[in-house]
């Protein structure tokens, strides 16, 4: 998803509409993570993004669990990169499918209205503006973009590790719901998020 986002952003950067760089966050959770980060940095440089920053982070799990610990470390790296470059916003490659998973995760934790709202397309956190331009697109659309640009995305092994809640929702729960309820459950969940978003924002 992030590689497809980089390709689209690079397209607009080449037109001179915006200046776009990239940050690669190496969580160090796989043995070859440094090599993957280096290869990704080269790919993004070849696309014309500048600067391309690689940030190695520590992921201390503690009491928050591996997924939340990785997210916390990642967003800390984003903040550091914004401060170093003066970037006006951070683009994130979350898709409609990610949104559906986030809604289900929130519901499973009893997060109330905020869980139904999922991820907002625009959010300011820690003084940094985050934009999610692909919340209306499917994960398959991201793969199509990569194919069209002759890019080979790296598939994070944790995305298929069903000991992690999000991967379990992606590969087991959502397919089960769609099989037994019928219809496009992921799209329905994402639509619910878009409707509930303004309410959650108001309540906040």
Which residue ranges define each predicted feature?
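ATP/NTP-dependent adenylation/nucleotidyl-transfer catalytic domains that generate, transfer
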Residues: 164-204
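Core alpha/beta nucleotide-donor-binding catalytic domains of modification enzymes
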Residues: 1-175
